[in-house]
C-alpha cells in the first residue's frame, strides 16, 4: 500500500495468492463460457439480420430503430430485463405461466443465469453489430451477384461463396469489438446477479 506510512514490498505475493484461489479459476471458466456464448449468438444473429436487411429492406428508419437498444446504458438495459424476467412479477414468467409452462428464475437459476446475461447483452449490441455487417455487405458491387446469377448460382450459394468471403474484414473487426466487450462485462452482472447464484456468474470483472 503506497499510501501507508510503512509500505511493505509484497513482490509476487498477490499473484501467488490468486493462483491458489479456486474462485479465480471459477471466474476464468465463467468468463470464457460467457465470451463464447455471447460472441456466437451476437455474430450469428448480426449476420442473419444484416442478410435479411440486404435482401428484404434497406429502410433508414429500421436502421435507426435497431440502434436504440445500443444507445441505452448497460445498467438501464439490465434493470429492464431484470424486471421483465422477474420470477414473480416479470411479464415473461407471467406469460409462461398463462400458457401452462413452469416459471423460471432466469437470473437465479444456475443453468440459465449465464445464458440470460448473454441474452441481455446480445439484445443490446446485436443491432449495432448487424449494421456494421450490413455496411460491409453494401460495399459488394451488384454486378458480382449478377454475374453469379447468370452462371446459375443460387442466392444461398452466392451468400456463402461471395458475400461471406468479401465481408471477412468486417467480420474480423466485429469479432475484435465483440471479444473486447465480452471480457469487460460487469454492469449486467452487478445489477442482476452480483456474481451469484453460487458464483456461476462471477466473471473476471466481478472477481
Name the predicted role of every residue range.
Residues 1-207:
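A structural signal for multi-pass alpha-helical bundles of membrane permease subunits
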